[in-house]
């Protein structure tokens, strides 16, 4: 099996407080799948899922740096925007076509300034 057969990539984002980040991601509709601690009291490494999309959140300082960027392709970014507003999410940038007529995009910042972009491709070649 080679890389060509790979079907899944999971980005990891650095967070200062897993508890605060978990609450934020749950406000977006994500749900905790699992958490891991090497020992009790040590930093948290966790998996969060939303409609089959997975991200890892890590309190471990050596894993990655705050200020990451992740793109999520979703079926309807405008409907998701409405959901986020109903959930009380502070959306950084409302859905727009700044990246081209065939791509709708909105962005949200998490508590650690990781940018999450949600995109809908409106036309496929």
Task: Annotate the PLM regions.
Residues 1-3, 46-47, 60-62, 97-98, ...:
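Short secondary-structure boundary/capping segments
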Residues 12-14, 31-39, 96-98, 121-125:
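Conserved catalytic-core motifs of GNAT/GCN5-like acyltransferases
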Residues 16-19, 50, 70-115:
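Vicinal oxygen chelate
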């Amino acid at each position: 099996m080679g890389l060509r057969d790979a079907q899944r990539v999971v980005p990891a984002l650095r967070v200062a407080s897993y508890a605060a980040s978990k609450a934020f991601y749950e406000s977006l509709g994500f749900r905790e799948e699992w958490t891991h601690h090497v020992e009790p009291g040590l930093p948290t490494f966790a998996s969060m899922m939303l409609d089959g999309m997975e991200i890892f959140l890590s309190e471990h300082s050596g894993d990655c740096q705050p200020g990451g960027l992740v793109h999520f392709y979703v079926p309807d970014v405008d409907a998701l925007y409405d959901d986020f507003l109903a959930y009380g999410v502070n959306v950084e940038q409302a859905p727009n076509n700044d990246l081209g007529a065939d791509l709708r995009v909105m962005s949200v910042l998490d508590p650690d300034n990781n940018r999450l972009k949600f995109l809908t491709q409106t036309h496929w070649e």
